[in-house]
Curated annotation (Swiss-Prot):
SUPFAM superfamilies: ARM repeat. InterPro entries: ARM-like, ARM-type_fold, FAM65_N, RIPOR3. This is RIPOR family member 3. It comes from Danio rerio. Residues 492-509 have a biased composition (Basic and acidic residues).
């Protein structure tokens, strides 16, 4: 509830005051364990920082009236609060680091420096928090040691008091008393040290809430005490329900043995009426986030006091609020400011080399062509070898004269990390200055004055491969010679240093990979069409069939049409040109191809030679399409038939093709599982999963109809839980990627959610993340459904997983999953019986459960230890009361009845008996005639335990088997007579 407030001294107007003390106020330096009391300053306001005052009486009472439990509670709360602070600031640091990676490195952008400065300050603050945590933990260990020493001394004193008195015992008792007193003094000193590390509590007044109890004109006085500190403020209720208070905020220094005492009185003239008094523990406020405290002043809660408490682990001068800083919020807004661009300085070596390379790729008309054959000779050494023609500073300064020759030397700075990073960034994304930015101030500007004033460079002849000539006849300029050994060594070292940086960003798939994925997608569509023709007319299967047909209609049949020329690279174009010579691999002879009048193509498996390629080479005309040779005609018919069957289809985006392949494979696996099972429960689970996959295919079809530049996964993640979008971007390192590798997924999980895993054993974190990856890749609770693509993960699989389990907080979900993984370890350990007994009530309802837990619970029913087996059966019996657990477990165990392993079927049968799953009676009854005697007995007992429904299923299966036996006997008799 919001309350209108007005303060005579708001917190934003000046320095926040320290709380007043009953005995006085020390300076900031006096806070460091000074026990001398100052004169009372009740009459005047406090402008400095109020220190902590451990007076003599306080210290004495602390020595003889120890409260180690309270100190332990403060230690735990302080350590937890510091770790929360560290976690929050670490998250903020990760966010800023991602901003820094996404921001193009440019020394002329002021916002980049602000971001760098913010990151450095945050790193220093995190290091200080880590040091503070280490000090607290070290102090806590020392305190625990002294605590145990005190307890030991007390026990020995008690033992000596019970024994007969003697001289030796009296001396020992004196020594024990001395040691006990020293331990108490050490504990008292440690408590004083701890109080210094407690930080500050900023208490902010938020007003009174009283409904009908608060009337205009009422005056209230609020007194807040914490140990010897106090804060007294007066407030008045205005006619417009606005509340006016003296002060807004006060700073308190927490005490170990002191609690907040809040006293509210109503002031009426010269008298005052006590409204209520409340005590609050200060240990509850050691949290990273601000806490809104609503205190019931009266017993019935008719008047409430609203206070906001913010804990700062350090002094006020070093406070760093957890909320987003102003500099970080203004990063993007500063991009358009005046100082976001400054006049360019002298170009660096990297800029000169990169711009010269772009000049070589530029055509005569000023456009960039990937088909330029002259651009293939671009290299770093070509620029160094022809450095006499390098771009000089006057070209940037826009002088009308010719550029001055400048010799560039490759020194040690070339291999600097920043230079390499700038080089790779420049290759990835080039932002050319606008014409107005590069225009010459003089009217005599010409094309020479443009920023694109470069000369062509080529690789030195001594470094060229055999047969490769990239220097044109018009480029007869003299070039400097370079020692071949030195040049090769320089080029190799440069490539080795830049390989790791470029490899991360240069992951463009090859044309062969794209074709392979497109062919697999086409084959999967054909297989699904065939499979759906044999299935029954179920609503979900109808939708799937309709969606498959829509994909066949929507997807692009020509793989080349989906490529954007502007985004192709030189390597891709080289593959296209080399692919035009596939006819050399064809099965052609001189007799079969006279004067190129007819061409007979053989299936060499190396490449395809279609009509468009022949047209491009001038080997086919309109009249030559109708070949006269019968063999040639048969070859063309066969070629066209194969092309029709194996037509490659694509969405236009490689990662989206991969995602489509994965989900088509999932649909195929689910359809096979649907045919193999005869259980209605399993059918229902598979149908639910198929409906989710149909929705995925609908989204892929909608995305494939967009332009290639507009296809992105960001729209899909906009409605996901908080943090999922940033998490997925880091998994795939791109906004538009629809797939990521499992290694990248696990790395991102470890980075973002490792703090959510409450690891109690070594290796548990990796086990949790691997289990999560397995669950995201799997489909439903059916155990027979296997993984389709174990090496990658799609964004749609992640979305389906979030939808299947109704996840609103991914981090909390991982925390629950970590508990399940720990439960798996407990069920596999010698303490499995204890873990089974603890598994009850809410612990069962919180389970997903995972397939591994269900398998272990079933397996433990046949454990050699009969107590463990009995505990497992009782656990499953208790779990049957949880509807969600029972529904998933019954589907899982019913599907396991089809397993080829006899032991697995036996365990699943016993589990269904414990769960009282009468809906699976038909499937269990089928095991009655199994070859294994134990399995037959378990199936008979399970079916009969289901009551009337089980007996009916048992009788039905018995009749079926009797009819089969009779038919078999008649068949044998007939064979004997014949």
């Amino acid at each position: 509830m919001s309350v209108k407030l007005k303060f005579d001294y708001p917190a934003d107007g000046g320095m926040v005051q320290r709380s007043r003390s009953f005995t006085g106020v020390n300076t900031l330096g006096g806070r460091r364990r000074l026990s001398s009391a100052r004169s009372s300053l009740r009459s005047k306001a406090v402008t400095g920082k109020s220190p902590r005052i451990p007076s003599n009486s306080r210290a004495g009472s602390s020595v003889w009236g120890q409260q180690p439990e309270q100190v332990d509670r403060i230690f735990q709360a302080l350590r937890k609060g510091l770790k929360d602070y560290l976690e929050s600031h670490q998250t903020e640091l990760d966010f800023l680091s991602s901003q820094q990676r996404d921001t193009k490195r440019n020394s002329r952008l002021a916002f980049f420096y602000d971001l760098e400065k913010e990151i450095r300050a945050l790193e220093r603050y995190i290091r200080r928090l880590e040091f503070q945590i280490s000090k607290v933990e070290e102090l806590y260990e020392s305190y625990c040691i002294q605590w145990r020493l005190c307890q030991g001394a007390l026990n020995m004193k008690r033992a000596f008091s019970l024994s007969p008195s003697s001289r030796q015992s009296r001396e020992s008792l004196l020594e024990l008393n001395r040691n006990h007193r020293h331990s108490l003094e050490d504990m008292s000193a440690m408590e004083a040290e701890l109080e210094i590390l407690l930080g500050e509590l900023h208490v902010k007044m938020k007003g009174l809430i009283g409904f009908a109890r608060l009337c205009p004109g009422d005056q209230y006085e609020v007194l807040i005490r914490l140990g010897r500190q106090r804060w007294r403020i007066r407030g008045r209720i205005q006619t417009d329900d606005r509340q006016m208070w003296d002060e807004e905020e006060m700073v308190f220094l927490p005490h170990i043995h002191g609690n907040f005492e809040i006293k509210v009185t109503e002031v009426k003239g010269l008298s005052s009426i006590l409204v209520g008094m409340v005590t609050c523990r200060s240990a509850d406020f050691f949290t990273a986030r601000p806490q809104m405290m609503v205190v019931d002043i009266t017993e019935l809660g008719t008047i409430k006091l609203q206070l906001e408490v913010v804990w700062n682990p350090f002094d006020s001068t070093e406070v760093r609020p957890l909320t987003a800083s102003a500099s970080r919020q203004s990063i993007h807004s500063r991009k358009g400011s005046v100082y976001s661009w400054t006049p360019p300085n002298t170009p660096s070596f990297t800029e000169k080399y990169f711009l010269s390379m772009m000049r070589q790729m530029q055509d005569a008309d000023g456009s960039f062509s990937i088909g330029s054959r002259e651009s293939r000779g671009v290299s770093l050494l070509s620029y160094l070898a022809d450095s006499t023609q390098a771009l000089s500073p006057p070209a940037y300064e826009k002088t009308s004269g010719p550029p001055v020759a400048q010799h560039t030397v490759l020194d040690a700075k070339i291999q600097d990390d920043d230079l390499l990073k700038t080089h790779t960034d420049a290759e990835e994304s080039v932002e050319w200055p606008s014409e107005t930015d590069t225009a010459s101030p003089s009217p005599a500007g010409s094309k020479r004055d443009s920023i694109f004033l470069f000369h062509r460079y080529s690789t030195p002849d001594i470094l060229k491969q055999s047969g490769e000539m990239s220097v044109s006849a018009g480029e007869g300029d003299a070039q400097e010679t370079t020692n071949p050994d030195e040049a090769t060594e320089q080029e190799t070292s440069f490539k080795q240093e830049t390989e790791d940086r470029v490899a991360v960003k240069d992951r463009k798939p090859s044309r062969a990979q794209k074709k392979a994925v497109a062919k697999r997608v086409s084959a999967l569509l054909e297989d699904l069409n065939t499979a759906l023709e044999e299935t029954s007319n179920v609503e979900t299967l109808k939708k799937l069939d309709l969606q498959i047909r829509q994909l066949n209609h929507v997807l692009k049949k020509d793989l080349d049409a989906s490529q954007v020329p502007s985004s192709q690279t030189l390597a891709v174009e080289e593959e296209e040109v080399l692919g035009s010579f596939d006819f050399l691999s064809a099965d052609c002879t001189e007799d079969e191809m006279p004067i190129m009048s007819s061409i007979r193509l053989g299936n060499t498996g190396i490449g395809s030679f279609n009509e468009s390629t022949l047209k491009s080479m001038g080997l086919l005309c309109q009249e030559q399409r109708c070949v006269s040779s019968e063999d040639s005609a048969e070859g063309q018919v066969r070629l066209r038939g194969d092309a029709a069957v194996k037509a490659s289809v694509t969405t236009g985006v490689y990662s989206l093709d991969q995602a489509l392949e994965t989900h088509l494979s999932v649909c195929a696996v689910l359809l096979r599982a649907l045919k193999q099972s005869d259980s209605d429960l399993v059918h229902k689970d598979i149908m639910d999963e198929l409906s989710r996959q149909v929705n995925v295919l609908e989204k892929i079809a909608a995305l494939s109809q967009k332009l290639i530049d507009e296809i992105s996964a960001a729209d899909l993640l906009s409605k996901t839980p908080k943090g999922i979008e940033v998490f997925w971007k880091e998994c795939c390192e791109s906004d538009s990627a629809f797939c990521c590798s499992t290694e990248a997924f696990l790395r991102a999980l470890r980075k973002h959610f490792i703090h959510k895993v409450k690891a109690k054993e070594p290796g548990q974190t990796d086990a949790v993340f691997n289990q999560l990856l397995h669950q995201v890749q799997c489909s439903g609770m059916v155990a027979s459904v296997t993984l389709c693509t174990a090496e990658r993960l799609t964004v749609f699989q992640l979305l389906v997983y979030l939808s299947r389990w109704s996840i609103t907080d991914f981090g909390e979900h991982i925390s629950l999953l970590s508990k399940e993984v720990y439960l798996i370890a407990c069920l596999e350990s010698p303490k499995r019986r204890r873990a089974l007994k603890k598994l009850k009530g809410k612990r069962i309802s919180d389970l997903q459960p995972t397939g591994r837990i269900l398998q272990l619970l079933a397996k433990l029913q046949t454990d050699a230890n009969h107590k463990v087996a009995s505990a497992a059966s009782s656990c499953l019996n208790r779990a049957s009361r949880s509807k969600s657990f029972r529904a998933k477990a019954v589907v899982h165990y019913t599907d396991l009845l089809k397993n080829s392993n006899t032991n697995v079927r036996h365990e699943a049968c016993l589990a269904l008996k414990s769960l009282k799953a009468s809906e699976s009676a038909e499937q269990v009854a089928e095991l009655w005639r199994s070859a294994d005697e134990d399995l037959r007995n378990a199936a008979r007992e399970t079916v009969l335990s289901f009551g009337k429904k089980g007996q009916m299923a048992f009788q039905r299966m018995d009749q079926i088997y009797e009819l089969q036996d009779e038919a078999y006997k008649n068949l044998e008799t007939e064979i004997t007579i014949l």
